[in-house]
Amino acid sequence: GNNGNNPSSEIKLELSETHLFASSDAITKTVALTANADWSIDQNFTESEWAWCSVTPTYGSAGTTTLTVDIQANGYDKRIHDFSIRSGDTDILLTIEQKQVVYFL
């Protein structure tokens, strides 16, 4: 028994980018997720919230997966949202930050 200190048993969960910035326009961005075990994404929107961004796919297995982040056009308030990506006991966040519409008079 190596008391669970075997490095091969550690969860690896990495994003090519952890914080995406978007202008107020609708846009689709992609992020690479690399994992060595099954993973899933919690969109973290409650039923009463407007889900202004989404990530697909929401689950997968070991390897590198391209996540597609769809961001809808924004109004007059800057907004930010965290998606939780979980594999085993490991959790990482993907943060989406979107600028508000700016009027030039």
For each predicted feature, which ranges?
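A short beta-strand micro-motif common to beta-rich folds, especially ectodomain repeats
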Residues: 67-69, 77-89
